[in-house]
Amino acid sequence: EGCVPTKSLLFCAKQYAHALHGTDFGTTVEGAFYSHEAALKRKDQVVKRLVRGVAASMKANGVCVFQAVGTLRGKADTGEFLVAAGDKSLTASRIILATGSNAVVPPIPGVREGLEAGFVLTNREILALHDAPKTLCCIGGGVIGLEMACYFASIGTKVIVVEMMPKIAGATDPEIC
């Protein structure tokens, strides 16, 4: 839904671009064809491999994982924070709030109806889209939107980006943009 799947798709598209423009570097690839479906399969494999690797790394480093809803329960007498995870009581001196993210759905007329009808997509749906669209309008010029725009444009989709701020990638360093 984010960085790793997007980077995987961008890498696939970059390989396709190398095949198409290889003559610039003395390489000719006859009949280069891009399969968005194959790129999606590779993306899923990369994500699964990364998840397995992270799980193995956490286990090797002694990280305990509790599959449960976590709730803050105040402070213990020791000054540490109390956390309930299912039927377990845990303590920690610091808490990282890392609950994942969801796409922000702005109050733009027609967006909710478009989501329900399936023609408006968040980053979650677009990363699972089996057929690349002929045209795509990306509302939002943030990092994820721009990565999606670049990916789809590089595989032949006509892309338009609409950004309300004075520049795209607004959260980046002004010296970069």
Which residue stretches match the model-derived regions?
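Glycine-rich flavin
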Residues: 1-132, 165-169, 174-177
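Rossmann-like NAD(P)H-binding beta-loop-alpha module
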Residues: 130-172
